[in-house]
Swiss-Prot record:
It is a multi-pass membrane protein. This is Olfactory receptor 3A2. Disulfide bonds join 100-192. It is found in: Cell membrane. The keyword ATP-binding does not apply. It comes from Pan troglodytes. PANTHER family: OLFACTORY RECEPTOR. Belongs to the G-protein coupled receptor 1 family.
Length: 315
C-alpha cells in the first residue's frame, strides 16, 4: 500500500490475482493445459490467416473479415494467458496497478472489436445471399476497410471509456482479485469508493456495444433465412449453411458468454462461474474459432491441406 500524492488515502500499488486454482499441486496441470491451448490457438489462427493470404480462392470479403478475426483471436488470448503462465512459473501472483489497467484496456479493445467484426461478417453474408448481383459493388475493398476501421474506432472508444472510468476509483483495502486476469466486475468488488456510476456506465455502454450488434446480426440473418428458404437447390442450401452456420455458432458462443459475464454484477463475491466464463472468453472461444470456420468450409480445408503439404493452388 502506498499513500496517494496530495490526499490522505492509501492506494493499492498492486493486485494479487488468485488464479484458477489455489493448490500448488494443480498449478503444473493448469500451466500445461493453458500452454497447450495457447499454442493450439496461435497455430490454428495463424494457419487460417496464412491460408487466406496465399490462396487466391479465399481473396473474398468473407475471408478478409475472417482473417481479421484470426488476428483478434491471437491478440485476445495473448492479453491474458502468457501473463498467467509467467505467474505460474515464477510463483508470483501479483500484478501492478498500471499493468492491470493496461490488461483491462486491451482486453476490452479486442472484445469490442470482436463485437463489431462479427456484425460486419453478418452484414457481408446478408449482402452475399440477398443481393448477389450487386454484392461485389456493395462490399468493395473500400467498404471492407471502412467497416474494419469503424470497428476499431468504436472498440477503442469503448475500451478507453471503461479504463478511464476505472482509473477514477479508489482502491484502499483488499487487493485480492478472484480471477486470473483483471476485469471490471472483479475490480468493482475491491473498490473502496462507490462503483454505482461505473456499473451504470457498463450497462449503458454494454447495451450499445452488445445490444446494437446483436440486433443488427439478428436482422441480417432474418433476411438471410427468408432468402435461403426461397432457394430450391440442395447445393444452394448446403453452401448457405456452410458459411452462415459457422458464423452463427461463433456469434452464439461469443455473445452468450459475454452477456452472462457482464450482465450479472449484483453478486457480492466473484465465483468460480466467473472464472469459467473468463476461460471461455479468453481461451476456449479463440481456440475453437479456427476449427469452427474450417470444419464446414471445404475451401478453407483445401487451402490448409495445400499449405501443410507444400502444394500450390491450381487457381
Amino acid at each position: 500500500m502506498e499513500p496517494e500524492a496530495g490526499t490522505n488515502r492509501t492506494a493499492v500499488a498492486e493486485f494479487i490475482l488468485l488464479g484458477l486454482v489455489q493448490t500448488e499441486e494443480m498449478q503444473p496441470v493448469v500451466f500445461v493445459l493453458f500452454l497447450f491451448a495457447y499454442l493450439v490457438t496461435i497455430g490454428g489462427n495463424l494457419s487460417i490467416l496464412a491460408a487466406i493470404l496465399v490462396e487466391p480462392k479465399l481473396h473474398a470479403p468473407m475471408y478478409f473479415f475472417l482473417g481479421n478475426l484470426s488476428v483478434l483471436d491471437v491478440g485476445c488470448i495473448t492479453v491474458t494467458v502468457p501473463a498467467m503462465l509467467g505467474r505460474l512459473l515464477s510463483h508470483k501472483s501479483t500484478i501492478s496497478y498500471d499493468a492491470c489497467l493496461s490488461q483491462l484496456f486491451f482486453f476490452h479493445l479486442l472484445a469490442g472489436m470482436d463485437c463489431f467484426l462479427l456484425t460486419a461478417m453478418a452484414y457481408d453474408r446478408f449482402l452475399a445471399i440477398c443481393w448477389p448481383l450487386t454484392y461485389s459493388t456493395r462490399m468493395s475493398q473500400t467498404v471492407q476497410r471502412m467497416l474494419v476501421a469503424a470497428s476499431w474506432a468504436c472498440a477503442f472508444t469503448n475500451a478507453l471509456t471503461h479504463t478511464v472510468a476505472m482509473s477514477t476509483l479508489n482502491f484502499c483495502g483488499p487487493n485480492e482479485v478472484n480471477h486470473f486476469y483483471c476485469d471490471l466486475p472483479q475490480l468493482f468488488q475491491l473498490s473502496c469508493s462507490s462503483t454505482q456510476l461505473n456499473e451504470l456506465l457498463l450497462f449503458a455502454v454494454g447495451f450499445i456495444m452488445a445490444g446494437t450488434p446483436l440486433v443488427l446480426i439478428i436482422t441480417s440473418y432474418s433476411h438471410v433465412a427468408a432468402a435461403v428458404l426461397r432457394i430450391r437447390s440442395v447445393e444452394g442450401w448446403k453452401k448457405a449453411f456452410s458459411t452462415c452456420g459457422s458464423h452463427l455458432t461463433v456469434v452464439c458462443l461469443f455473445f452468450g458468454t459475454g452477456i452472462f459475464n457482464y450482465m450479472r454484477l449484483g453478486s457480492e463475491e466473484a465465483s468460480d462461474k466467473d472464472k469459467g466464463v473468463g476461460v471461455f472468453n479468453t481461451v476456449i472461444n479463440p481456440m475453437l474459432n479456427p476449427l469452427i470456420y474450417s470444419l464446414r468450409n471445404p475451401d478453407v480445408q483445401g487451402a490448409l491441406w495445400r499449405i501443410f503439404l507444400g502444394r500450390r493452388s491450381l487457381t
